[in-house]
């Protein structure tokens, strides 16, 4: 039922996550559920899946990466965080403590001087350094839009317009009511939270 959107160019990454909580299938229980976990100054993770797994895995990941930065004096890069998340889900999958979560990881790598967008699903399948990614059923409606309209040199305004187009398509075609989305952008200057997309 949930929907995550990620769009990346060399200069920025835009992430959006729905704010809905569903119960008993498609019944909207809450419209203010935050699915974002900040992993660093220029690094964040959007997480969907089973509600308990999302809360536990998101918090566990956030605290472990914060501990790493305290112990070592620097934050991990976005690609390193992506590998850590993928390995954590893979190890959990082979134990009794597996997490049923799908994540999008976005950030800006100062060392490589470019934005990063990656995803990991609940079976630990990872995709790194992608131009656009979706998690959730609504993504099936949006890949055609991105295939047709995505450009590597899009401005932030063009990227946001394209993201809004995808969210609008999901709103129009998906059976469940998703009332709003949290939107963030990360670039060389840092992390910014933008106005929510509301319907």
UniProtKB/Swiss-Prot annotation:
Lineage top rank: taxon: Eukaryota
GO cellular component annotations of the record: cytosol; nucleus; proteasome core complex, beta-subunit complex
Pfam families recorded: Proteasome
Presence of the UniProt keyword S-adenosyl-L-methionine in the record: no
Keyword set, alphabetical order: Cytoplasm, Nucleus, Proteasome
Coiled coil spans: none
GO biological-process terms attached to the record: proteasome-mediated ubiquitin-dependent protein catabolic process
InterPro entries the UniProt entry points to: Ntn_hydrolases_N, Proteasome_beta2, Proteasome_sua/b, Proteasome_suB-type
Matching SUPFAM superfamilies: N-terminal nucleophile aminohydrolases (Ntn hydrolases) (SSF56235)
Compartmental location: Cytoplasm; Nucleus
Keyword Cytoplasm found: yes
Segments passing through the bilayer: none
Self-association and partners: The 26S proteasome consists of a 20S proteasome core and two 19S regulatory subunits. The 20S proteasome core is composed of 28 subunits that are arranged in four stacked rings, resulting in a barrel-shaped structure. The two end rings are each formed by seven alpha subunits, and the two central rings are each formed by seven beta subunits. The catalytic chamber with the active sites is on the inside of the barrel.
Family statement drawn from the similarity comment of this UniProt entry: Belongs to the peptidase T1B family.
The protein's role, per its UniProt record: Non-catalytic component of the proteasome, a multicatalytic proteinase complex which is characterized by its ability to cleave peptides with Arg, Phe, Tyr, Leu, and Glu adjacent to the leaving group at neutral or slightly basic pH. The proteasome has an ATP-dependent proteolytic activity.
Name assigned to this protein: Proteasome subunit beta type-2
Organism, scientific name: Caenorhabditis elegans
The encoding gene: pbs-4
């Amino acid at each position: 039922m949930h929907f995550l959107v990620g769009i990346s160019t060399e200069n920025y990454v835009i992430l959006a996550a729905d704010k809905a909580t569903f119960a008993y299938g498609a019944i909207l229980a809450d419209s203010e559920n935050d699915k974002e976990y900040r992993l660093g100054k220029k690094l964040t993770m959007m997480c969907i899946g089973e509600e308990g797994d999302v809360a536990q895995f998101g918090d566990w990941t956030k605290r472990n990466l914060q501990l790493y930065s305290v112990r070592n004096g620097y934050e991990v890069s976005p690609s390193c965080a992506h590998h850590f998340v993928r390995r954590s889900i893979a190890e959990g999958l082979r134990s009794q403590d597996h997490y049923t979560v799908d994540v999008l990881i976005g950030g800006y790598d100062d060392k490589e001087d470019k934005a990063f967008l990656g995803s990991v699903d609940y079976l630990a399948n990872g995709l790194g350094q992608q131009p656009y990614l979706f998690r959730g059923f609504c993504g099936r409606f949006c890949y055609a839009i991105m295939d047709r309209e995505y450009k590597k040199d899009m401005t932030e305004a063009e990227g946001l317009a394209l993201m809004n187009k995808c969210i609008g398509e999901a709103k129009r075609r998906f059976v469940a009511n998703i009332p709003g989305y949290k939107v963030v952008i990360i670039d060389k200057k840092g992390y910014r939270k933008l106005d929510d997309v509301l319907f």
